[in-house]
Design a protein with these regions (language model features):
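Amphipathic coiled-coil/heptad-repeat helices and related helical stalk/stem segments
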Residues: 1, 43-44, 88
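Non-catalytic pre-domain segments flanking phosphatase-related domains
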Residues: 1-17, 165-169
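Substrate-recognition element of Asp-dependent hydrolases with the DxDx(T/V) motif
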Residues: 48-72
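A positional/architectural concept
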Residues: 23-52
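Asp-based phosphoryl-transfer active-site loop
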Residues: 10-28, 119, 152
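Structural motif
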Residues: 61-63, 84, 108-109
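Mg2+-dependent phosphoryl-transfer enzymes with acidic/Ser/Thr/Gly-rich catalytic loops
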Residues: 38, 74-75, 81, 89-169
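Short coil/turn segments at beta-strand junctions that form active-site/ligand-binding loops
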Residues: 11-13, 56, 104-105
């Protein structure tokens, strides 16, 4: 990790992540009964746990109105799950007040156009390897990991490394 990334990661007190395309592979899976299913990576759940153990909270934010996302957020013990969010920048302002953090103390992970504006407002921005090119042009870090394959865990490990925190439970 280069010194610029370490400097940005040291300040992080809160991680906000998009869901579809970051915590999932972005695919839409349907059961034979028409029920929507999503595949999550357990490594990301451990990343949330490691951050929380070190007083760094996680927030899920998605434009989808999904019960599955709410359930996953609860299982991962995230600080908050925001669904059906059409304007992520406005929500960021509220989150800063609720969690008493500055924008430069927030990391954001996103993969698509609806993440573009918020990525420009936070202290550390990340897009997965399969994020859109527009985000790759502006993100502080482009992961080599695709969404749904543990990109959140990679970011969690980077933040903890920058803060000289050992990642054992």
């Amino acid at each position: 990790m280069n010194q610029k990334i370490i400097k940005l990661c040291k300040k992080i007190k809160l991680v906000i992540t998009d869901v579809d395309g970051v915590l999932t592979d972005g695919g839409m899976y349907y059961s034979d009964k028409g029920e929507i299913m999503k595949k999550f990576n357990t490594k990301d759940g451990m990343g949330v746990e490691l951050l929380l153990k070190n007083n760094i909270k996680t927030v899920l934010m998605t434009k989808e109105n999904s019960i599955i996302v709410k359930k996953r957020g609860k299982k991962m013990n995230v600080a908050a799950t925001y669904v059906n969010i059409k304007n992520k920048e406005q929500e960021l302002e509220k989150i800063c007040k609720i969690f008493d953090v500055k924008k430069n103390e927030i990391a954001y992970i996103g993969d698509d156009l609806n993440d573009y504006n918020i990525i420009t407002l936070v202290g550390f921005s990340v897009t997965p390897a399969n994020g859109i090119n527009q985000l790759k042009e502006i993100a502080n870090f482009i992961s080599k990991i695709n969404g749904g394959d543990g990109v959140f865990r990679e970011v969690a490990d980077m933040i903890l490394f920058a803060k000289n925190i050992k990642t054992n439970l």
